[in-house]
């Protein structure tokens, strides 16, 4: 009975070992498939990231070129407006100076006319009146021209103020857009760093450092180590069960089983080897 039980347990252990080997083979195949899928995904992610970086760089370059072009155009327009205002101011000063000179001339001529009226005859009076009318007409034309120039000057100054305000607002919006872009970029980088696991980092660094042959060698050694570890755990568990059975359930198991399993010569060798630690009961069992 005991021999049949031992044979049955041996068969069970062999079948369990075979099942374990099959399971480990299946796990190895599944791991290889998963590793291939992970490598494909990583390649795809790297490709997508490179494409995103290229497109983003192109878009940012185009936006910066457009913004620089618009700012340069606005600055050029502002410079032209400033030059126009300076020219109009110079023209206004010359016109004011000429008007003051004309007013002085008119006052002088009016004084002369009054003096002539008092001293000269009627013909000279008519000539002076005609000249005075001509001078008044030219003065009116110059005054109209001065009003026109003043209106243009006011319009140009208003345009300059509006342009400066628009440029200020445009610069503020540009700063806001730059800050928002920097914040978005930082958020993306932080989310990437948070989402990445330390194990994934090590895995990616190892993938970047090592060659495919080194990767496969490492994986194979890891798998062998795992298999050996699990097998040793299994045998340690079996030995612990055996020790528990011999210690607490059936202490005479070895005494009953050894003579049936081993021959007399092997039992004699065991007796010689384990003689100091043998009890009287087992010593009586062994051959003399």
Curated annotation (Swiss-Prot):
The keyword Metal-binding does not apply. Its main location: endoplasmic reticulum. It is found in: Endoplasmic reticulum membrane; Nucleus membrane. The chain crosses the membrane at residues 224-244. Pfam families: TMCO5. InterPro entries: SMCO2/5. GO terms for cellular component: endoplasmic reticulum membrane; nuclear membrane. It comes from the Eukaryota. Residues 10-192 form a coiled coil. The keyword Transmembrane applies. Keywords: Coiled coil, Endoplasmic reticulum, Membrane, Nucleus, Transmembrane, Transmembrane helix. Belongs to the TMCO5 family. This is Transmembrane and coiled-coil domain-containing protein 5A. It comes from Homo sapiens. The gene is TMCO5A.
